[in-house]
């Protein structure tokens, strides 16, 4: 069980805010592109993703000692965390989290920061246009990560003229988010 209380997050320091915030994004996105995603989890993933893009930079800026508090951004990030947690508990996570646990543990990198460093590479790997169906989970459909990333790009407002452009814009937006929070 997790207790997510925005009041406890109001004074979270900048590095913890950036790392935990990008971890929330990774939870939501990995659950959304999962072959185990369902109609139940999809909406949660989309909502959490949108909230992270809308509120993580604000929450991060409010984390500095001399900054004006932003309780709305903190509360929205707490909600995004809870929503993404419910989604990934049902749809599961992917290789980004698997790799970041090892990378973070070995090099003493905060978990969310490790997720952020790997995220664009994992998105590109997962977005192969001709994925193969895994025999291990033969009852599940083919991976459709590329289409899912395109949907998320459209959701956050970075649509291109083609799906490929939208995907590239999605990657750029995720990279920009990292810059906005100094990762």
Where are these regions (language model features)?
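Short beta-alpha connecting loops at secondary-structure transitions
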Residues: 10, 101-105, 133-137
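Gly/Pro-rich interdomain helix-loop hinge
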Residues: 109, 113-183
């Amino acid at each position: 069980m997790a207790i997510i209380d925005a009041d406890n997050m109001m004074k979270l320091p900048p590095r913890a805010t950036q790392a935990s915030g990008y971890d929330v994004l990774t939870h939501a996105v990995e659950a959304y592109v999962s072959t185990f995603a369902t109609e139940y989890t999809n909406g949660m993933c989309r909502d959490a993703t949108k909230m992270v893009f809308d509120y993580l930079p604000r929450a991060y800026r409010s984390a500095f000692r001399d900054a004006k508090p932003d309780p709305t951004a903190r509360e929205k990030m707490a909600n995004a965390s809870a929503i993404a947690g419910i989604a990934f508990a049902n749809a599961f996570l992917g290789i980004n989290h698997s790799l970041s646990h090892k990378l973070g543990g070995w090099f003493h990198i905060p978990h969310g920061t490790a997720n952020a460093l790997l995220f664009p590479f994992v998105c590109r790997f997962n977005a192969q246009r001709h994925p193969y169906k895994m025999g291990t989970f033969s009852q599940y459909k083919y991976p459709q990560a590329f289409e899912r990333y395109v949907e998320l790009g459209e959701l956050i407002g970075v649509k291109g003229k083609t799906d490929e452009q939208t995907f590239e814009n999605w990657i750029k937006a995720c990279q920009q988010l990292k810059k906005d929070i100094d990762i």
